[in-house]
Amino acid sequence: MYDRKIKNYSNFFKVLSNDVRIKILFELAFSNKNYTYLMEKLDLKQSTLSNHISKLREYWIIYTLKKNGILEARLNRKVLSEYLCEEIFNPHKLSVENYELDKV
């Protein structure tokens, strides 16, 4: 179980380790944005933006919906909070006994 959880965290951080995806998150931190705005602001082609959005959606970091026929991206603050704060850095959620630690 812990190996699967560690792999999931590793993949989550891989998704975040891309400059363009971080820029997308910075834009969404202030307000929801439609795809056209993001393409223009970040100087991306539609296919490039879609690929990055799909990676972020894979881990529910963002979600999309149509508003008045326009596709809009939204930051999922709850998921980010769970991954970045509550889960990893909360000693009550994970215990050291479940990991093999190297002795120095």
Predicted features and spans:
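N-terminal helix-turn-helix DNA-binding core of bacterial DNA-binding proteins
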Residues: K7-T48, K66-L80
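Glycine-centered, phosphate/nucleic-acid-interacting loop/turn motifs that mediate DNA/RNA or nucleotide
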Residues: W60
